[in-house]
Design a protein with these regions (language model features):
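Acidic, small-polar-rich N-terminal luminal/periplasmic segments of exported/outer-membrane proteins
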Residues: 1-135
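N-terminal, post-signal-peptide soluble/periplasmic segments
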Residues: 3-18, 26-28, 75, 80, ...
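Transmembrane beta-barrel architecture of outer-membrane proteins
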Residues: 30, 38, 64, 122, ...
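Outer-membrane beta-barrel translocator/receptor signature
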Residues: 78, 91, 100-103, 114-191, ...
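Transmembrane beta-strands of outer-membrane beta-barrel proteins
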Residues: 138-140, 166-168, 203-205, 264-268, ...
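Residues on the lipid-exposed face of transmembrane beta-strands in outer-membrane beta-barrel proteins
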Residues: 154-158, 191-195, 252-256, 308-314
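Outer-membrane beta-barrel channels and translocator barrels
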Residues: 161, 196-200, 259-261, 313, ...
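Acidic/polar loop-and-plug regions of large Gram-negative outer-membrane beta-barrel proteins
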Residues: 173-177, 187-257, 267-303
Length: 322
C-alpha cells in the first residue's frame, strides 16, 4: 500500500503555503523520504524522478550541475540556474551540489521561474536546507560499487541550549571510472546554526565548503555518428593533472512573525569560488577518422557574489472586491 504525501507545503520557492492543486503553475516536490528511498546523492540522481527535466553537459565530466527544463537548456558557461531557500546560489563558479544537507528539492516548471532573478524560461530548481534540531541525532552512510566509486557521509545535529542548535554534515567521494586515466575526488563540509531569539524571531546560518578535483574529460569523438575509438579511450593528457574547484558559500536568514498573517523574511548570502588547472581537450576529428586535433587550455577563474533579499509576506482580505 502506498501513501500520498501531503501536497500542502511551506515552500521557500513559491513564498507561501499552498496546495499544489490550487496554484497556476507546475511544481514537482521531492522530499527527504523520497530522496532516501531512491538513494539520491547528487542533483543528477534526482532528475530521473521528475518529468520534463533532463541531464545536460556537466562540463568535462561532472564539474558542475547542468540540466534542461522542458527542452530549454540552461547557461552552458555557468550551469543550471538554481536557488537555495529562495536565494540564488549558482551565479559564477559552482561545484556540483551535494544533497547530504538538503531537506527537499523543488522543481518549478515554466516561465514562473523568471520571477526569481537569474532564471530560465523552462524552469528553476530550489534547494531547501536541512535545519538544526533540538533533539540529538546522528547518521552515517557508506556507499561503494563495482566501478570503484566510494562515498562516506556523516550528519549530526544537537541542541547547545534552549535557544541554540547546530548541525554538521561531512561527505567525501572518491570516484574511479571505466574510462582510462579518469577519476575525481570531492570533500564537502557544512556547519549550520539556528538561534531562536524569541517565539516570533529566528536566525539561521548555513555554510558550505566544497573542494572538487578530477580529470577534465570531454569524452570521445564520433564520425557520422559512429564511434571510431574505444569508448574507454581518454583523449586528453594524463600529465595535465586535475582541474580543481573550490566553492565556499554562506547564507544568513532572519525571520520574524508579527502575527499569524504577517511575516518578515530577510536574508543575505556570500559565495566565493575558484576553478584552476590544465586540460587537453579534443577539438576536431579529421576526415580520415584517425587524426584527432586537440588543444591545451589553462583555466584560472574566480567568482565572488553577494546577494541580499527582504520580503514582507501577509494575507489581505479582498472579499469586499468580489
Amino acid at each position: 500500500e502506498s501513501t500520498r504525501e501531503d501536497v500542502s507545503q511551506n515552500s521557500s520557492a513559491t513564498k507561501f503555503t499552498h496546495d499544489v492543486l490550487d496554484v497556476p503553475f507546475n511544481r514537482a516536490y521531492l522530499s527527504k523520504q523520497i530522496m532516501e528511498q531512491q538513494d539520491v546523492q547528487r542533483i543528477d540522481d534526482a532528475l530521473t524522478l521528475v518529468s520534463g527535466v533532463f541531464h545536460q553537459n556537466s562540463f568535462g565530466g561532472g564539474f558542475w550541475d547542468n540540466y534542461s527544463f522542458r527542452g530549454f537548456s540552461t547557461d552552458p558557461n555557468l550551469g543550471a540556474a538554481m536557488i537555495r531557500n529562495g536565494l540564488s546560489v549558482n551565479r559564477g563558479i559552482s561545484a556540483p551540489k551535494d544533497v547530504v544537507n538538503i531537506e527537499s528539492l523543488e522543481f518549478l516548471k515554466g516561465p514562473m521561474a523568471a520571477l526569481y532573478g537569474r532564471g530560465e524560461t523552462g524552469g528553476l530548481l530550489n534547494l531547501n536546507s536541512k535545519k538544526p534540531q533540538w533533539e540529538s541525532e546522528s547518521e552515517l552512510n557508506l556507499r561503494a560499487n563495482t566501478q570503484e566509486q566510494y562515498r562516506i557521509s556523516l550528519e549530526h545535529t544537537a541542541p547547545i541550549n534552549d535557544e541554540l542548535a547546530y548541525r554538521l554534515a561531512v561527505a567525501h567521494e572518491d570516484n574511479q571510472s571505466f574510462r582510462d586515466h579518469v577519476s575525481s575526488e570531492r570533500w564537502f563540509f557544512s556547519p549550520q546554526l539556528t538561534w531562536k531569539i524569541s517565539d516570533q524571531t529566528q536566525l539561521d546560518f548555513d555554510s558550505e565548503f566544497t573542494e572538487h578535483k578530477g580529470t577534465f574529460d570531454r569524452g570521445v569523438s564520433t564520425v557520422n555518428h559512429q564511434f571510431v575509438m574505444d569508448p574507454k579511450t581518454f583523449t586528453g593528457e594524463p600529465d595535465d593533472g586535475d582541474l580543481k574547484i573550490k566553492d565556499y558559500f554562506y547564507q544568513l536568514r532572519l525571520s520574524h512573525e508579527f502575527n499569524p498573517d504577517w511575516k518578515l523574511n530577510s536574508a543575505v548570502s556570500y559565495k566565493d569560488a575558484q576553478m584552476v588547472g590544465f586540460a587537453t581537450e579534443p577539438r576536431r576529428m579529421q576526415a580520415d577518422g584517425r587524426t584527432l586535433e586537440r588543444q591545451r587550455r589553462y583555466r584560472d577563474y574566480t567568482s565572488e557574489d553577494v546577494l541580499a533579499q527582504t520580503e514582507l509576506l501577509g494575507k489581505i482580505d479582498t472579499s469586499w472586491a468580489r
